[in-house]
Every structure is written in structure tokens, then in C-alpha cells.
A protein has these predicted regions:
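Acyl-donor-binding surface of acyltransferase catalytic domains
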Residues: 1-23
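A short helix-loop-beta-strand connector motif used in the catalytic cores of GNAT acetyltransferases and
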Residues: 55-67
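Conserved GNAT-fold acetyl-CoA-binding loop/helix
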Residues: 38-53
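A conserved beta-turn-beta hairpin within the catalytic core of GNAT-like acetyltransferases
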Residues: 82-91, 100, 122-124
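Short, contiguous, helix-prone interaction/anchoring segments in small proteins
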Residues: 15-39
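Conserved beta-strand in the GNAT
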Residues: 67, 73-82, 89-94
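Conserved beta-strand-loop-alpha-helix junction that forms the acyl-donor binding cleft
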Residues: 100, 126-138, 155-157
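Conserved acetyl-CoA-binding loop-helix of GNAT-fold acetyltransferases
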Residues: 92-95, 101-118, 139-144
């Protein structure tokens, strides 16, 4: 996505759903959410990381983490990572299993895209990687919010 005007937002009218930035950095939070959200989708790239690797990642100045709550219960999260070329990647994004199917994913993604554009006036692109291991409707959600496919790759198994 190359402009905030391309966003087609989806709002959650349920006031019990709230999204907040984690102002106090805690690499364990990033690790635990990655493991909890990603377990269902077989996220494995960081599963073997040491605590030191998680600390370096979770405390990196270019990373911002947001958590979603439903009735004060943790429901999901997303991470935004700014690069040196004006891009912001939605590095990780997802809901905990018990919150999937409640219509919250579109609102969570809308928040992620809006916050990515707010990171700096110099942001020129917001992007995300997805794969066939993600939720079956992940790509449809990205496209419904205005994102377009940039490139397809076949991964070796």
C-alpha cells in the first residue's frame, strides 16, 4: 500500500474490543504472543530463538507492538517494523484462537495500517508478508483493506 488513502477501513462497533500500543517494551510479550497466535498457523521461523535473540528483536527501536483486548482479555496483537527505505512492515499480526471468527480481524488490520502510516511523515509504503500457513482468510482481509499482491513466491519444502 503506497498511500493511506488506499485503506478501506473496517471498524468494530463493539466497544469491548480495544487496541493499545505496548509503550513499555517487553520482549517476552512479543515472544509469548508470537507463540500463542502462531501455534495454530505453524509459525516456526522464530520458535527456536533464544532469549537473547528475542530481546534484540523485541527491544529494537524500529519495532512497535500493539495488543488487542476483548472485555479486558488479551485477544491478539500486531507488530510494526520500520525500515530505512520509508516502508513499514506489518511484521506479525493475528488473533488468539478463541477470538478468531468474531469479526475482529478486519478492525485489527485497519488499526495496524493506520498506525503504520502514523509512524512518520516519511512513510511511503505499508506492507505485509503472508503465506499459505496463515489463516485461510488472511489474504482476503489484506485485500479488503486495500492492499494488493506485489509478488508471489514458491517456497521450497
Amino acid at each position: 500500500m503506497h498511500s493511506p488513502d488506499q485503506l478501506r477501513p473496517k471498524r468494530c462497533r463493539d466497544g469491548r474490543f480495544q487496541i493499545r500500543e505496548k509503550k513499555e517494551r517487553n520482549w517476552r510479550f512479543n515472544r509469548d504472543l508470537y507463540l500463542a497466535v502462531g501455534e495454530v498457523w505453524s509459525w516456526n521461523d522464530k520458535r527456536v530463538w533464544t532469549d537473547e535473540q528475542w530481546k534484540e528483536y523485541g527491544l529494537a527501536p524500529e519495532l512497535r507492538t500493539f495488543s488487542a483486548y476483548y472485555e479486558n482479555s488479551l485477544a491478539g496483537y500486531y507488530e510494526l517494523c520500520r525500515d530505512n527505505e520509508g516502508g513499514v512492515e506489518i511484521a506479525y499480526f493475528g488473533l488468539l484462537p478463541e477470538f478468531i471468527g468474531r469479526g475482529l480481524g478486519g478492525a485489527l488490520l485497519t488499526s495496524a495500517i493506520e498506525e503504520a502510516w502514523r509512524m512518520s511523515p516519511s512513510v511511503t509504503r505499508v506492507w505485509v508478508h503472508t503465506c499459505t500457513l496463515d489463516h485461510p482468510l488472511a489474504l482476503a482481509n489484506y485485500q479488503a483493506r486495500g492492499m494488493v499482491i506485489y509478488k508471489r513466491e514458491a517456497a521450497e519444502s
